[in-house]
Amino acid sequence: MRPISLRLHERPITQVLFNREGDLLFVAAKDKLVSLWYTTNGERIGSYQCGGVVYSIDVSQDSKYLITASADAKARVWDVSSGRQLDSTDFEVSARSIEFSQGDKQILVVTDQVMGCQAKIHVFDFDKDEVRKLNKSYTLPSPQCKITQATWGPLNKTIFASCEDGAVRIYCTEKRELIKTILDHNKLVTRIEWTKHRIMFMTCSKDGTAKLYDTKTLKLLRTFDTGRPINAAGISPLKPHVILGGGQSAESVTTTKVDASQFKVRFFHIVYGEELGGLIGHIGPVHSICFTPDGKTFATGGEEGLVQVNHLDESYFEFDDDLVYNPPVQH
């Protein structure tokens, strides 16, 4: 498996994202750019220029609209094909996370806790037929701590928020209030990642663990311990595998013993919890991992501004996990 290296960004990658068909790859970075690439050959199509560090992006189901959240306190809507900015909305502080609801009728935006402002989750109605695409709907109550990411639950009935205090908070979108708090991590929760159809979700944390939950019962199913901060997870839609990435943060690398192997992305079996292998490709912490919807390709983005696109070999799909964990009985 030979990765395609995408080199354009001069600062750390914040998010890598495939569209619904998996043929386009969007890359957000701290150099105020979002770049667009073809997945198959790594050819660059173009880029979208924002006014500040781009923290989060999402793309609509039909791949027509791109939304960005950036440090210049703006959420923007872009036309994917022309690169034109269609709409934007201003906040008092940086926009940290952004996501389309299922069906693309609404957008949530998370704003930072800074300069006396409380972290908030803002929900906007998204109307693609109107000139003004974003119309404010409501704001959820603040958790009184920084929110790293927010994401829509199944059928948009809930919103899940990962927080700085190690909690995952769940809000009801109908009642617009906090209904549940999960307190299983003892450090900042960096990301929430869904399985296909949102039956289960995984939380990543700076405490070195990733935890898998049942969405309906919120029961903890499995804990994956890597012994180092986890920034991102990619759950395969095709096989029972999860890829975890992270590593010591840039500021603590100089004060602790560090080697390149801790920045490799690691494959785990989602059912048995055992490590299957790893892949070295970055020389700094991995910040984002994303699978294509068909599960045949995944991309990773790192601290050094490099994006690696890995097209998985046929041998990966022919590998039968059951032969490893349930070997045939010898008579």
From Swiss-Prot:
WD repeats: 8-47, 49-88, 142-181, 184-223, 281-320
GO MF annotation terms: RNA binding; translation initiation factor activity
One Pfam family cited in the UniProt record for this chain: EIF3I
Disulfide bonds: none
Main location: cytoplasm
Keyword field: Cytoplasm, Initiation factor, Protein biosynthesis, Repeat, WD repeat
PROSITE patterns, per the entry: WD_REPEATS_1, WD_REPEATS_2, WD_REPEATS_REGION
Matches recorded under SUPFAM superfamilies: WD40 repeat-like
CC per GO annotation: eukaryotic 43S preinitiation complex; eukaryotic 48S preinitiation complex; eukaryotic translation initiation factor 3 complex; eukaryotic translation initiation factor 3 complex, eIF3m; phagocytic vesicle
Subcellular location(s) per record: Cytoplasm
Extent of the signal sequence: none
SMART domains, per database record: WD40
One BP term from GO: cytoplasmic translational initiation
Transmembrane segments: none
Role summary: Component of the eukaryotic translation initiation factor 3 (eIF-3) complex, which is involved in protein synthesis of a specialized repertoire of mRNAs and, together with other initiation factors, stimulates binding of mRNA and methionyl-tRNAi to the 40S ribosome. The eIF-3 complex specifically targets and initiates translation of a subset of mRNAs involved in cell proliferation.
Description of how the protein assembles with itself and partners: Component of the eukaryotic translation initiation factor 3 (eIF-3) complex.
Family: Belongs to the eIF-3 subunit I family.
Protein name as annotated: Eukaryotic translation initiation factor 3 subunit I
Taxonomic source organism: Dictyostelium discoideum (Social amoeba)
